[in-house]
Curated annotation (Swiss-Prot):
Belongs to the COX17 family. It comes from Mus musculus (Mouse). Changing residue 24 to G: Significant reduction of copper binding. Keywords: Acetylation, Chaperone, Copper, Cytoplasm, Disulfide bond, Metal-binding, Mitochondrion. Cu cation binds at residues 23-24. One of its GO terms (molecular function) is enzyme activator activity. Residues 1-20 are annotated as: Disordered. This is Cytochrome c oxidase copper chaperone.
Length: 63
């Protein structure tokens, strides 16, 4: 049937590109932030927490 071709799913390349999840964004700042919080406590890591928030915002996350 000729009408079915138009209803077929997108090519595999388009399906593989999924939106970035917050857990996977900014791994460098996330790792530094988490290590600081574990070692020193959250109250001593404000600069790393803010750096991670800025990175997330730059990627379009609303934090």
């Amino acid at each position: 049937m000729p009408g079915l071709a138009a209803a077929s799913p997108a090519p595999p390349e388009a399906q593989e590109k999924k939106p970035l999840k917050p857990c996977c964004a900014c791994p460098e700042t996330k790792k530094a932030r988490d290590a600081c919080i574990i070692e020193k406590g959250e109250e001593h890591c404000g600069h790393l927490i803010e750096a991670h928030k800025e990175c997330m915002r730059a990627l379009g996350f609303k934090i």
